[in-house]
A protein has these predicted regions:
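Transmembrane beta-barrel strands of outer-membrane/channel proteins
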Residues: 3-5, 39-47, 89-95, 144-156, ...
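Residues that define the transmembrane beta-barrel architecture of outer-membrane proteins
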Residues: 14-20, 35, 65-71, 107-113, ...
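Solvent-exposed loop/turn segments connecting transmembrane beta-strands
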Residues: 9-17, 33, 100-103, 170-173, ...
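Flexible internal linker/loop segments at domain or repeat junctions
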Residues: 189, 193-230, 234, 239
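Flexible, solvent-exposed loop segments that connect beta-strands
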Residues: 52-62, 160-169, 203-221
Length: 309
């Protein structure tokens, strides 16, 4: 678990958020005994924002809530200076968002350089020596596994009225869905497949009967259901899996549900064959759709479990 502090240099409008997050990292490539290229990802929550308010904070057009999700990815070089100290430098990409649960939700993105000094509490002198023996890695049993995810969330909605004008919905709408994905496990770190994606989006095709936004009505449930197909790819790590998906709805009633969507998801292992699912659905790579918070089950799982020994 990590803790961070961000200075936004616009404290009256944005605040300076504090982050609390899970993190995981590993070596990508090793150039010699002291130098390596590594990655690290962070996922958690950020606190202390000053959200948009029409009277008190009208200039903040990007953040609408006091608590927001926090995503961060680092790629960096790591120099082992001594058994206790490392020097790191690289690039960090960060995203803050409330997952479309409040307006506004433009989100905030940043990219920057990373420089740090790491103190290793338990590392020993042997870290500089080349190991005399490395345990052989068993051949990976390639196979097809099946992931079933059930998720739900809530969202706000911008409704188009008049000549392209948008008004914010006065309420939040429920979202419920499932994913069923046969995944081919290529090796210890990668799996890919196709997913059948079903969703009920309570905000889909909401409309204003008078065209002025004074009243917003929901259509029949049939116009808020969709079934889609997406291609999936996942990077597998001990306890954590990061995945992406690209898909389109194939059965729907049109309108908001006629879309090309993208999915970014984190799966956190609970047992060998079950996991927590935290995902985000986008439309056309830039329009936020909804969070995907749920639970998943994996069937026909033949993945070796070294980290549980």
């Amino acid at each position: 678990i990590g803790v961070g502090y961000y200075n936004m240099y616009e404290k009256p409008q944005l605040g300076n958020p504090l982050t609390v997050y899970l993190f995981q990292g590993a070596r990508i490539a090793r150039f010699n005994q002291r130098l390596s290229l590594n990655y690290e990802w962070n996922f958690g929550a950020s606190f202390g924002w000053k959200p948009y308010h029409s009277d008190l904070n009208p200039y903040n057009k990007v953040i609408g809530s006091k608590v927001n999700a926090y995503l961060n990815t680092n790629f960096y070089f790591n120099w082992m200076l001594s058994p206790k100290f490392d020097f790191t430098t690289g690039v960090a990409v960060t995203h803050f968002s409330n997952g479309n649960t409040k307006f506004p939700n433009a989100g905030l993105n940043s990219i920057g350089l990373k420089v740090g000094l790491v103190y290793n509490i338990n590392r020993k002198e042997e870290c500089f020596a080349k190991p005399l023996y490395q345990s052989p890695v068993p051949k990976f049993p390639r196979h097809i596994s099946y992931d079933l995810v059930l998720f739900g969330s809530w969202r706000r909605k911008g409704v188009t009225i008049g000549e392209g004008q948008m008004v914010a919905s006065p309420e939040t709408y429920p979202v419920l869905g499932f994913n069923f994905a046969p995944m081919y496990n290529f090796g210890y770190k990668f799996r890919a497949g196709i997913s059948l994606d079903g969703v009920y989006d309570g905000s889909a095709n909401v409309y204003s009967p008078d065209g002025y936004g004074d009243e917003l009505l929901k259509p029949s449930a049939g116009k808020q259901l969709a079934l889609g197909v997406s291609g999936r790819a996942e990077y597998v790590m001990p306890y954590f899996t990061v995945g992406i998906g690209l898909g389109t709805n194939v059965i729907h009633a049109g309108g908001d549900l006629k879309s090309f969507y993208q999915i970014l998801a984190l799966k956190i292992e609970v047992t060998r064959n079950s996991f927590l699912h935290i995902g985000y659905n986008l439309q056309d790579f830039h329009d936020p759709n909804y969070l995907m918070l749920g639970f998943g089950f994996r069937f026909n799982n033949k993945y070796p479990t070294f980290h549980r020994r």
